[in-house]
Design a protein with these regions (language model features):
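Polar/charged low-complexity regulatory segments
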Residues: 2-235
Length: 235
């Protein structure tokens, strides 16, 4: 009986997983069409000459590039949030050495295509790329763009993060944490030091300290460093 029950539960799980996969597939198709204001056939045609082996190219972990072959597009999709003042630099990376052939489309050497779009989001810009240009993917990663820090993006919520929900929770977990945890602790230190003086214009010393504690303690590596420092100080 237990064996039959296990088989039935396994069957149900497999059906659920297949439904989820189909839903994600449709979501990715609709997102690509919506973002770049074209149709799926046009996107597939633009990247038809991309070798499938391109998907095995080693690429930097941040911001991350997803191969879109599962929806018939032989290209990488990249999405990240950046600060507003970084946007011109980002756009120039996309446009440099490429011919603009449409509102969202750039071409290099005839067969290297890039689709680009952007939208305002939380004191910054959300940028999207669809490209078979590996050099561009690496250049974007090397430029080290970053999302607006939480004390700007969510200034109105304050530094308390114990009860995040909705858009704020999604932003912290999928935008900020993804960027922040990609940095080393030394790089995090440098990031904060670079922004200390500008934060003085709208945050008191006490508020700044509260924001730093809230942001930094989200990272397990930083919490471990605090524990190590505490143990060392007690000796």
């Amino acid at each position: 009986m237990s064996s039959l029950k296990w088989m039935f539960e396994q069957f149900v799980r497999e059906r659920q997983n297949k439904r989820i996969e189909r839903a994600l597939l449709e979501e990715h198709k609709k997102a690509a069409v919506r973002l770049f204001e074209t149709n799926l056939d046009a996107l597939r045609k633009a990247f038809a000459c991309s070798p499938v082996s391109l998907q095995s190219t080693p690429l930097p972990s941040y911001p991350g590039a997803m191969w879109m072959g599962h929806i018939g597009i032989n290209a990488f999709s990249m999405t990240q949030d950046i600060e507003v003042e970084q946007f011109p630099v980002y756009f120039n990376l996309v446009a440099a050495g490429r011919e603009r052939v449409g509102q969202h489309q750039f071409v290099r050497d005839g067969s290297i295509h890039t689709f680009f779009c952007s939208a305002d989001r939380r004191s910054g810009k959300k940028v999207n790329l669809l490209t078979n240009d590996v050099e561009l993917v690496r250049a974007v990663s090397a430029a080290a763009f970053n999302p607006p820090p939480p004390w700007l993006a969510w200034y109105e919520l304050g530094s308390l993060m114990c009860s995040l929900q909705g858009d704020a929770q999604h932003w912290y977990e999928n935008v900020w944490d993804r960027y922040w945890e990609n940095l080393s602790l030394a790089e995090q230190d440098a990031f904060i030091e670079e922004r200390r003086s500008s934060a003085n214009a709208y945050l008191t010393a006490e508020e700044w300290a509260e924001w730093l504690e809230a942001v930094r303690t989200r990272d397990a590596r930083y919490r471990e460093r605090l524990r190590m420092d505490y143990r060392r100080d007690r000796r």
